[in-house]
């Protein structure tokens, strides 16, 4: 979003991929992605979906890291090599590239979750495991991040 607008991407949505590997982005989020989106590998066997403008901000932070630091180079390579500049079709669908579907273990059932500034796409199986873990360990997780 631009200017002083405040927005956040929240919620949990169960979706299905079609035979072309597309998912329909929920209507409430489509305006956020009307100018394009980037789908990338996440750290937790999920996919990350950023509005192009938000992705540019993330990319600028990555690009400003020191090239002399091996971990800076590695995270930059990991992030950009697994990112795809995409858009929504007329029905609000986005094609999830095969390499990303394979990485995240996505076949036909997926869960899309809001993560404030971006969306995450999980295979239903991986999401159910992660969600159960988070529920069971919520107090410890909150303490670890000093929430």
Task: Annotate each predicted stretch with a short phrase.
Residues 1-15, 19, 27-86, 90, ...:
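Flexible "stalk/tail and boundary" regions
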